[in-house]
Amino acid sequence: ANTILMNCAECEPLLKLHRQLLEKHAYEIMKTFHMVQETVGASEAIIGIKKSYVQTVNALKQHIEEFPGMRIHLLDEVYPMGDEVVLIYEATGRVVRPGGLPIEQGVAVFNVETLYNIYQAVEKKEPVTAKYVSVVAEVNHPVTVKVPLGCTMDDVVAQAGGTTVKDPVYFIGGPMMGRIGKGSDPVTKTTNAILVLPKDHLIVQKKMRTSAIDLKRAASICCQCNTCTDLCPRNNLGHPIDPARFMRAASNQDFRDVNPYINASFCSSCGVCE
């Protein structure tokens, strides 16, 4: 890779884990990022961060001159900026081909927590046995906590003072791309956030719907305005995915042209077209 990229663009609403971690440990993470740059022989190291994260940006600016070859790239507050394919284009102008990998464009992407874990391993000889998790929404004290890997979601929510609704549903991840979980589910290396929501919340109801219901709704509601395709982040990068054509074909069970179905495999599941 000739370019390495740090992803500090929280992809979803309500998530603050990476910006908080980077603000608190700016020097340590930047030092590790520079070490990775030297190790892989990259000529450029870019910190991609949303311009709205003012406190974190200020923390980075205090140390940026200490690391030659590293720069801060300020990003707009739009969704899904944290998608690495979108981030790569915004920060470097390079387009990852449909179904391709960033390394094909000479780019390697690291998230903030991964770099902090590298710092812990290299500088302190500590293995990864814990995870930072944000607990938000219907809890008494929204908080980001460090918890052991393998502990239950109930254990984590308890660190936020418990829930404020009678029948809570644990939504693992962000509101756009997350999934419904159980209180007994373990924290894993990919657990970034727990949203506690009432069971009648729109987001919960949407996740519980079947694809058959979604297709019937699309067939009855779609007015062929093409806005879903106009907003599709992958389509805007030139990828062949076309949500409008796919929904039109699927809702009418039209299989004469299979390309809309094949190209749907390039979907990033961001949910913008919903």
Q: Residues of each region from the PLM?
A:
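Conserved mixed alpha/beta catalytic, RNA-binding, or beta-rich assembly cores of soluble enzyme
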Residues: A1-I4, C8-I29, K124-N140, V145-T164, ...
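Generic secondary-structure signature for well-ordered alpha-helical cores
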Residues: A9-E10, Y27, H34-A42, Q62-G69, ...
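Generic structural signal for well-ordered, non-membrane alpha-helical segments
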Residues: L22, A26-I29, Y53, V57, ...
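Hydrophobic alpha-helical positions that pack around
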Residues: G41-M153, Q159-K166, G174
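Residue-level detector of family-conserved "landmark" positions at structurally sensitive sites
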Residues: I47, D167-P168, D242, P260
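Hydrophobic alpha-helical scaffolding
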Residues: K50, E104-A108, P142-V147, A218-C223, ...
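Ferredoxin-type iron-sulfur electron-transfer modules in oxidoreductases and energy-metabolism complexes
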Residues: L197-A219, T229, N235-E274
